[in-house]
């Protein structure tokens, strides 16, 4: 399969650069996978697509203010984007500077704080901060908005680039499908008889990296840490027993569940995943999906195409562009039921 098969033209004006005033005010494009039928709704109408007995699985990762500005002790300015917190003081980070720092270089953080560059791991730098890193980031860090939101972060992003159920700090990008849910909607979902469960996948900056090969099969995915607990396994089992559907909120929840079921059976799992889901790959757990609109030629668009079928997905995206839907992290959403016989671009 060619990466170019997943290209579509997106007008710049459809990229959402700010969130709407209310989380649930987004639009919802519903795609019935088996038939390809589309329905244009509001996100609050999601309740109409859920059934008593269903299970919704959310990603409860918490975005950390992972972007720091500062300078080398020698004076050269730099920008740090934390990719992964290793322990209380050490992180792996991307560094943007005119000249890459060498081991032993001391970095002075704008707003207070310092770190030492310990060693380089390919594209990432291992840094040791003089004080506990998470409180430091909360104090002087900036929210790591995606590269397509071409503006500085502001105070509102601290709240809105975060789900209302975020708990476990470690992500450097939001699980954006979850941004549409407020407490009232979650309460209404539970009141309808829909169960909820939470996985954790700390979304890395690699989620925004373009696919740099021509053929999908040659792409190597970035690694991200996730955890699927026994409680989630039990909730899925109970859902299956009562005839309900597993509804994943976001592609990160899909990747978590399917990573924990690579041999066909869902089991507790904690560790790194590099799962790459593209057309032709089976789904063992997820029956329906809530997701935002993704970048052209991205691995997430490939995942959606594997779930709903390639022709159905690309037709839905064409309709979304024609109808002026808002795209990407702060944009609108889709509700998709799985296509039992999805076709790829070459079928």
From Swiss-Prot:
GO cellular component term of the entry, any: cytoplasm
Lineage of the organism: Bacteria, Pseudomonadati, Pseudomonadota, Gammaproteobacteria, Pseudomonadales
Catalytic reaction annotation: 7-aminomethyl-7-carbaguanosine(34) in tRNA + S-adenosyl-L-methionine = epoxyqueuosine(34) in tRNA + adenine + L-methionine + 2 H(+)
Family as reported in the entry's similarity comment: Belongs to the QueA family.
Main location, first listed in the record: cytoplasm
GO biological process, one term: queuosine biosynthetic process
Gene Ontology terms, MF aspect: S-adenosylmethionine:tRNA ribosyltransferase-isomerase activity
Species the sequence originates in: Pseudomonas aeruginosa (strain UCBPP-PA14)
Keyword vocabulary terms for this entry: Cytoplasm, Queuosine biosynthesis, S-adenosyl-L-methionine, Transferase
Gene label: queA
Domain of life, per lineage: Bacteria
HAMAP family: QueA
Name of the protein in question: S-adenosylmethionine:tRNA ribosyltransferase-isomerase
